[in-house]
Amino acid sequence: MSFASEMKNELTRIDVEEMNAKAELSALIRMNGALSLSNQQFVINVQTENATTARRIYSLIKRVFNVEVEILVRKKMKLKKNNIYICRTKMKAKEILDELGILKDGIFTHEIDHSMIQDDEMRRSYLRGAFLAGGSVNNPETSSYHLEIFSQNESHAEGLTKLMNSYELNAKHLERKKGSITYLKEAEKISDFLSLIGGYQALLKFEDVRIVRDMRNSVNRLVNCETANLNKTVSAAMKQVESIKLIDKEIGIENLPDRLREIARIRVEHQEISLKELGEMVSTGPISKSGVNHRLRKLNDLADKIRNGEQIEL
């Protein structure tokens, strides 16, 4: 089972009070529902590919409106072989849509009805219903952080974005070919959203994976940094040894001033050690990294003068 499916399975087991059930149902029917006319009777069909979501829709409609609901199962055509579950009710169709703020004066509305998001719990419930209806979230173990909710109507996506941002989630929306999506990209905001809609088990799993990923990334960055520093140290040491050998060949190390002669010999004998370690091996007492670096720079400058055929003064 995918991370998104596990999360939806958890969300469908949450107990809610009647007004919160209405808010959740309002999102589910608005986003996945359709109204049709059969035998001069209005029929509501709510469609989903998730079996637990279908059971949730079934139980919420029966509980809130006390009407008969049937679940139909269809096989999806084309490449995907998922089942399609249709929750159908032929009773009180217009009354249900009107009470859920989906139908107003006989006209379908695309905006989120204010009566469905009157308080904090109802807003959370509406967002939970929206995620159950059109939500998906990447597996945090294998993918980049991404959570989105698909809406067929752009104005509903805008309303959903605004509702999510009332909780400072930094949600954004954009148009897609067959609708619009409201999405989150930041791991911290996805965690906040999971908590907001009651997905606490999903939140714990998400945070566990996030911590491991962050630690792994930190270690990788540290290793890369150490590797880069080591490469720089090795390159610098090779250049220094090359310069010292050139000086020895052309002038002779024994002809260098004492301070340069000693550091030159230590560097040639210990090509792998750091500047700090070089400084600790000086016979007159430890000298700082900057002191060692200053002497080695003088040796490099001297070698450059030899290469350029310049006059040398020791």
Curated annotation (Swiss-Prot):
Residues of the signal peptide: none
Record keyword Metal-binding present: no
DNA-binding region: 274-308
Keywords: Cell cycle, Cell division, DNA-binding
Pfam families listed in its UniProt record: HTH_WhiA, LAGLIDADG_WhiA, WhiA_N
GO process terms (BP): cell division; regulation of sporulation
Gene Ontology molecular function terms on file: DNA binding
Function: Involved in cell division and chromosome segregation.
Family membership noted in the UniProt record: Belongs to the WhiA family.
HAMAP family recorded: HTH_type_WhiA (MF_01420)
NCBIfam families reported for this sequence: DNA_bind_WhiA
Name listed for the protein in its UniProt record: Probable cell division protein WhiA
Phylogenetic placement of the source organism: Bacteria, Bacillati, Bacillota, Bacilli, Bacillales
Name of the encoding gene: whiA
